[in-house]
Every structure is written in structure tokens, then in C-alpha cells.
Swiss-Prot record:
This is Elongation factor Ts. Keywords: Cytoplasm, Elongation factor, Protein biosynthesis. Coiled coil: none annotated. It comes from Latilactobacillus sakei subsp. sakei (strain 23K) (Lactobacillus sakei subsp. sakei). The gene is tsf. InterPro entries: EF-Ts_dimer_sf, Transl_elong_EFTs/EF1B, Transl_elong_EFTs/EF1B_dimer, Transl_elong_Ts_CS, UBA-like_sf.
Amino acid sequence: MAEIKAAQVMELRKKTGVGIMDAKKALVASDGNVEEAIDALREKGMAKAAKKNDRIAAEGLAGVAIDGNTAAIVEVNSETDFVASNDQFKALLKDIAETIAKNKPADMAAAEELPMGEGTIASSVINLTAVIGEKISFRRFELVEKNDGDHFGSYLHNGGQIASLVTLEGADDEAAHDVAMHVSAVNPQYVSREDVPAETLDHEREVLTEETKNEGKPENIIPKIVEGRVNKFLSEISLNDQAFIKDSDQTVAQFVASKNGSVKGFVRFTVGEGIEKKENNFVDEVMGQIK
């Protein structure tokens, strides 16, 4: 029996989209021959999925599932927004989120191999790809844990184009939901200004200093102006300092404090962020249709 290397498993997964264990089993059966392994997987009903693996899945939905003190936020992609609105696609997203929250996998490799339905998460994704005829991809997830006295809040914008998950220490579920809505709408980068990395702050201060100098401000007041602008920058990227979307007369921190709580953390997924979408040339597209 040939030794199966990690690089072979990765290559087969890249070409077919199957899970780690399915790829390894196919390689073992084919004595390490990747092309034979692909054929074997196709014979098991994965051919259609394998042929679509070079397509870009940049649409889709994000969702949240809560299981006791554990919450999972996940993203599942499709090639078109039409498929993302399909009930089967929505059911897959829901099942994946619930499975992740319940089983708490350590990483994507472990998540893909979790039992779900009649197979695994990975096989369920491949099966739906074959049924719908469009590449489906389970892209990412994040797990969040809370204590008994904490509260989770989630909010889905536009049906799941943006998903936010917030954890409050104290307060209540309604407050957590409202803060999650704020996170979806305003997109803060950090919980508090203390969380902003020093290098980010130093860079911003340097840029603002040069900007202020170029405005011709008197040298003696430049430091004060810069610090004012730095504070404005921090208030724009820090959740606690942002004006609360439902009441701009108070900050998010003030709103949560009024509910006897504080913000512990948040996660925000925007569908397709970081994925380079394929742009078709219009002339090439027309020519392709008339060939």
C-alpha cells in the first residue's frame, strides 16, 4: 500500500471539494493515484460536484445558531444569489450552524467531518452541489462561548448577507439583539479603543499629523488638533464609543450600561468578503453564447 501524503489529500480535495476522510479513503483505494481517486469519487455521484470546483462561490448566506452557552456563526457560499434564496440552501446553512454549535469542532477540517444527516457536513455540501447544479461551499465558522450570566444576541441583515453575533456580560437578550443590529449596520472594528493595536494607532497619528501640517495649522496647536482627530478615529472604529444606532444621544457602552451590562465581544460576517469575484468580459460573454 502506497503512503498517502498530505499534499495528495489537499490536491484531491481541491479538485473535487470532498472532505478530508473521503479524499483519504479514495486515495487509499486507488493506491495513491489522484486521477483514479477522482474517477472513483465521480462514480459515487460526485462527478457533477467535481466538475464545478473551479467556479467561484462568492454569493450565499451567513447564519447563527445558539446551543446553550455556545454560539456558532457560519458562512455558506453559492455561485449566485438565486441559489442562496433556495429553501434547500437555507436548510443546509441552518443544519451546519446547529451542528457546529452542538459539536464545537476545533477547525474547518474537523467541522467538515462532523456527522450530519445521512453523512457529514462535507458530503451534505457536495450532495446539494450535485442536486442544485451550482457549486456550494462551506467557507468558515467561528465559535463563541459565554457564561451563565451573559447574553447572546444575533442579527441577520438582508436575510443573511451580513450576520452579527454579540456577547454581553449582564444586560438581557433584547439589549444583545439591539447591539448585534448595530454591529451589522455600523461595522465596528474593535470592542473598545483599548483593543486597537498600538501600530494601528501610531500609523493613524502619523498620517493625521502630516495632514494637519499640510493644512497650514500653527505649529503649537498641531498636537492638540491631532489628538482630537485621533479620538474621533477611535470613536468611529470602537463599538463602545460609537453612537448607538437606535439612540444617537448615547454611545453603545452607555446603552448597555443602562441595561446593567457591558460588551464582551462580537463577530461580524459579510458574505463573500475577501473573495475575488470573477468579472466576465461582456464581449466574451456574448461571443460565448453564440458559439
